[in-house]
């Protein structure tokens, strides 16, 4: 059973960083859930894993997945958001965009069905190999970020 602290962290709309608790957690099930919230997006997870998550965890994971998508591009269309966040309707997309505005300033264009990132307020956790993760190495890992920066620097000198 999920401890009350973890439940409160998941239900708190202002919390998106869980690494501190993941590092300290001793319970295997809770550690796995915290790793998912720290480092993965909803589309990274096996279907049997997402099927076992409750509504609050899925809602939080959708916000986190949207933030990951916003890190990749300053403009995202509704279809990309639906695919990345496992949503069905434009109404669900717009509700998610509004919830994400705690963490990123967005310009939402309902007619063009896209959102433009104006400013990032906070970023998601980054995996640095502190301890094992339940699935593949997360995209937001220290190694991947350093590699991307090296490639970017090389592209500037070419």
UniProtKB/Swiss-Prot annotation:
It is found in: Cytoplasm; Nucleus. Its main location: cytoplasm. Keywords: Cytoplasm, Nucleus, Signalosome. The keyword Nucleus applies. InterPro entries: Csn9_fungi. Component of a COP9 signalosome-like (CSN) complex. This is COP9 signalosome complex subunit 9. It comes from Kluyveromyces lactis (strain ATCC 8585 / CBS 2359 / DSM 70799 / NBRC 1267 / NRRL Y-1140 / WM37). The lineage of its organism: Eukaryota, Fungi, Dikarya, Ascomycota, Saccharomycotina.
């Amino acid at each position: 059973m999920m401890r009350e602290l973890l439940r409160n962290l998941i239900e708190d709309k202002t919390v998106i960083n869980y690494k501190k608790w993941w590092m300290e957690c001793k319970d295997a099930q809770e550690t796995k859930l915290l790793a998912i919230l720290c480092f993965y997006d909803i589309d990274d997870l096996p279907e049997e894993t997402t099927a076992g998550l409750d509504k609050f965890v899925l809602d939080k994971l959708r916000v986190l997945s949207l933030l990951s998508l916003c890190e990749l591009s300053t403009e995202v269309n509704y279809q990309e958001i639906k695919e990345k966040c496992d949503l069905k309707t434009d109404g669900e997309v717009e509700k998610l965009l509004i919830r994400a505005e705690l963490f990123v300033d967005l310009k939402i264009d309902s007619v063009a069905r896209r959102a433009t990132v104006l400013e990032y307020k906070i970023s998601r956790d980054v995996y640095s190999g502190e301890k094992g993760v339940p699935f593949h190495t997360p995209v937001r890992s220290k190694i991947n970020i350093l590699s991307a920066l090296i490639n970017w620097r090389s592209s500037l000198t070419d």
